[in-house]
């Protein structure tokens, strides 16, 4: 199944149905998963390989009610499921934990509940996936020039090998994503990966310049929505037809090769 077909199945479905579609996919793969219920939702995660230490791959399955939830974040779910498939087919023993968090859109409640219950002691880092279905370049955030870590170095090296652009951003409009609870708990090698275009980069520069000039909120929103990445963000138009199979496959390949390089 193409990755885009997975996104299509998820499009517009209620969050509970999206979670059920993920578990059905995992059942079809014959993969065991852990469901972690907490006060307001339920996380899912899958442990792969015999290694005690795990490389985390983060996704979230909830969507904002107004949005179909394709790029945000059906794209990441499709890649996460593909990483599980690749691990199975390779017969790999490298330790990986793939997360499908609930309630990212309402204050990172799912990832916060995971960290509060399980902690971070068996994780070497987290590759968190957010908006990975459009574009031909990777944005790593929030990652400044001084930040370092095995996963970060490996991902950037893989991107160079695959001749894919890869840029660090201190901030990508908002720094809120499921990497946050892990960093706050003391896991420094945790960051978010987003797929972008050169046009997104140019508009981001314009956006931050406007912030420095203290532009009005309406003007900032006008600038932001010119970026392909944010044109359909949290909108009913965030549907699978807007996404690219190539972007999904490129992300999956980069994440998988990073996992292999870090084992």
Language model features: what each stretch is:
Residues 1-49:
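A non-catalytic alpha/beta surface segment that caps or lines the substrate-entry region
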